[in-house]
Structures are given as structure tokens and as C-alpha cells.
Amino acid sequence: MSKNVVIIGTQWGDEGKGKVVDLITDKVASVVRFQGGHNAGHTLVINGKTTILHLIPSGILRNHVECLIGHGVVLSMSALLKEIAELEVADIDTTKRLKISPGCPLILPYHIELDNAREIKRGKAAIGTTGNGIGPAYEDKVARRGLRVSDLLDPNLFASKLKEVMEYHNFFLTHYYNANPVDYQTTLDEVLSQVEQTKHMIVDVTEQIHQHIANDENILFEGAQGALLDIDQGTYPFVTSSNTTSGAAVTGSGIGVTDIDYVLGIVKAYTTRVGGGPFPTELIYDVALDKGDEIGKVLGTVGHEFGATTGRQRRCGWLDMVTLKRSFNLNAVTGICLTKLDVMDTLETIKICTSYEIDGVETTIPPFSAEDYAKAKPIYIKIPGWKTSTIGTDSFDSLPVEAQSYIRKIEQLANLPVDILSTGPDRLQTLILKHPFE
């Protein structure tokens, strides 16, 4: 019997979702992206070769897998074509297996200009967006003025709609942000030339998904970013512009709620965050100044904690079970995939945050506001480190006893099983204790 599995990052993104998606797609007919845009990077390492994807589902490296981009994704045609070209250079064919929903909102040049103009105007209060136009594109969608992939199929209608919406946005760019306007004709010509290269990929993705279900075929739904960046449930306003929880798989693809059989929550063995926002367990280290917390330095250096999309340094800290337990509930997580355990191989002692102290009161419930988060002081339990390499370990029993204890403690605190364990960046450096599709 087939299964529909959702993979979700349970923290602030960068948990290692791409590798895990690629690994378990050996058993699927299709992989579906359902939210976000090209603001997130999924890094895959196969036989030592690194591939970074931003828009295209991570199943593209499997020749038998169909890759679907659902209507919940905001789509930059420029970014998509760039990614396709990079894959073709690596002899990975996308033309027959990549499909795009006509309902995808388009990211256009004025969205990017607005994104960057806003960050400049915010100054020190900048959110830390990737500057790729994701937020403004989602705003247009909600305001019902956004252009969608389906609009491109009628060039005359698209030209008319584009002119109207560009007049609106150029007014704000010039009069409020003191920025340069975006040229209408240049934008129109660029986008219409791009659609000729992608027209054959546009299909009814929702119908495609239900055909797979009718044919009793496995489907994997690939989340981007992390649940704690969710526009509604995250650390607002330091969040992304889409819903990043497992529920977005339903709204962003068209699968029914009761059709989801399993949710795999990806958990990094420590915590990272890019950009601004609350981070109670942060171990502050500035890579440019080579100054700050030494363990924060180890986690960032050994873990190569630099963004796949922006190259920005990721903030690092201890595992935070307060936020994680909320995330597990939000996503109805079935099982955990624990990643980057090997990054902590050299540490003498490891800490896990199990509660916060806020205004002198201990709590295991995460605060609602960013202001209260800023006052949260982490309360830790300590676990002995294992001080030996776990890279490429081929069985759970082969792990150091202390590493096993760390994993068991996470399972105990989460009340969930660790079904997959990543012990290195390569596809093969993974222990599947229970396969989500079995």
C-alpha cells in the first residue's frame, strides 16, 4: 500500500532536509515542493559531489522520480531556468520530469527591488530576508493583485495585468523608498522569453498528485525552511512569508488532509538560525572577528554553517527542546530524523535546553512574542560528550555509548522515535532505523 510522507524542518531551517529527501526518494514516484521560493537552499552530497537546489525538488537526482512544484510556491522563472541550466551542465535532465503548477505566483523584478528597498529602510531593524522578492510576491498573492504562471499562457492578458501592477509598485518604490522604478518593457520582454522555455512544464499539479494516489504510488512532500519560521506560528516578525508547517503541504499542493500518512521532522543535533530574531540557546560567535563563544565557533566551523543561498554565517547554539516540542505538535510529527550528530564529536559536554526562565518564572511553553523571547533564559541539562568520530557509523549499536545516550534522551524528551540518523553529509552516511515508506 502506498504512503504520502511530508518532510518538515522543525527548527529555523537548515536542518538538512535536502539530503534526507534525496535519500528516501528511492521508494517514491513523485516529490512535491509546496511552499516558499528560491530563498532556501537544499544541499545534497552524493559520492562526494555537492549539488545545491533552491526551487527544484530534491528528488531530481533520481532518474525515476517526477518533481512537482505546487501552487504554494512563489516562482522566479529566472531562478528556475538558472537552476535547470546548472543541472544540465551536470548531465541531470529535468525537461521530462519537472512540472510546474499554473497556480504558482510569480516573483518578478519589482518584487526583488521592493524586498531590498524595505530592508534598507528598516536599517538596524532589518529582518534579514534573502532579498529574493519572496515576501512581496506573497503579499501580492494575498492582495489578489499577483500574477501567476497561468497568466503567462496569454501574453496579451499578461502584458495588461503587468502594466497595472507595475504602476502600483513603481509608485511606492519612487515615492516612499526613494528607489529607482523598474522598467515595464524590459520586464515584459524578459518574462515572455522565459515562458517559451518552460511552457511544456506547466501542468495541473493537484490532478497529478491525485493520479499518483489513485495509482497507489508513494509521494514525498518536501518542505522548505523550518517550522519556527512559519508566518503564523513562528517567532514573528522574524519569520518567512509562507506557512512552513506540515499543514502547508495540504494548502500548497492540493492533497487532502487525511491523505497524509507520516510526517518526518528533521532535527539538527544542535540549533542554528540565519538573520535576526530570538534565539535563547545561542552561543554567540562572530566569524569575521574570530571572537565569541568557543563552542559556537566549533559548531559553526565543523558544521560549515553558512547559508547555501546567501553564504551568510548561521548563528549556532544548543538544542532547544522548548521550541522543538511545540514544533513537533504543530507538525504532528510521526518520527524524527536527527542530523549533524557528527559535528559534536569533539565536545566534552553537551547541553540540551529543557525549559526557560522568563521574568523569574520557569516555563516549558515557548513565549508568544519576540519581546518575551528576548527575555528567555535557557535552563539546561548536561550530557557527557563522546569525544570520538561518529562519521559514517553503519549501525546504531556501533555508536559511542554517550552518543546513544544523547539520542535516547532526545527521544525521551520528545516522546518520539528517532527513525533516521545522519552521520555525515554524504547520502550514504545515514542510518535508516525505520523507513518512512515502509
Curated annotation (Swiss-Prot):
The keyword Ribonucleoprotein does not apply. It is found in: Cytoplasm. Disulfide bonds: none annotated. Keywords: Cytoplasm, GTP-binding, Ligase, Magnesium, Metal-binding, Nucleotide-binding, Purine biosynthesis. It comes from the Bacteria. Mg(2+) binds at residues 14, 41. GTP binds at residues 13-19, 41-43, 314, 340-342, 422-424. It catalyses: IMP + L-aspartate + GTP = N(6)-(1,2-dicarboxyethyl)-AMP + GDP + phosphate + 2 H(+). Substrate binds at residues 308-314. IMP binds at residues 14-17, 39-42, 130, 144, 225, 240, 312. Its EC number is 6.3.4.4. Its cofactor is Mg(2+). GO terms for cellular component: cytoplasm. Belongs to the adenylosuccinate synthetase family. Homodimer. Plays an important role in the de novo pathway of purine nucleotide biosynthesis. Catalyzes the first committed step in the biosynthesis of AMP from IMP. This is Adenylosuccinate synthetase. It comes from Ruthia magnifica subsp. Calyptogena magnifica.
